[in-house]
Amino acid sequence: MTSGVDSDVSCRGCFGRWCSGEDCCEIEYRNNSGAYGYTAMTPNLGTANKVVPLDLASPNVNGEILCQKGSYMASYGNVEVEVKFDFNFCRCCCAGMGFAVQKIVGSGVVFLCASGTVVQKILGPGEKILIDTDCILAYSATCDLDIQRASRGVMGFVGSGEGFFNSSITGPGIVWVSESIQNISIYLGRSSD
């Protein structure tokens, strides 16, 4: 952080941030000097190695995204971190996002932390994509999240390694998919013998 950049702590919207996997308070950095300055940051998740910038004002986003808990890193401009509760029992338990979903709204730019390769897919109206439940990073609030059986038979559930369900997201909107942080953590924890 350069000189002239001041920090302050804000607890505005703390309940929504806390329910969506963030700290109750957030640090706000401001350059009050009038000269060029910067603040450097890194992802805060154990194996996250990517910073994904998303412009909330872009046409396919329409000012609101839903994302994985704890993936919010930073933002600038008009951005609020909130919570959206999903009361559909099957979706809460099996779609990979949980009961309290992180909702980010505004017209600024948000930075999410992710792991591995990040893929962005623009979905047209009614277009659907199936995703491993651990790999959803974020999606436009205009999209619909649901679940779909991963396999038709019992042997597929038991032997495929996919579990019982995949997440299905239907457009219009944008979906961001990344490698599962849980899977990378397991891989990194193994010995190299």
Q: Where do the PLM segments sit?
A:
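Composition-driven recognition of glycine/serine/threonine/acidic- and proline-rich low-complexity segments
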Residues: 1-193
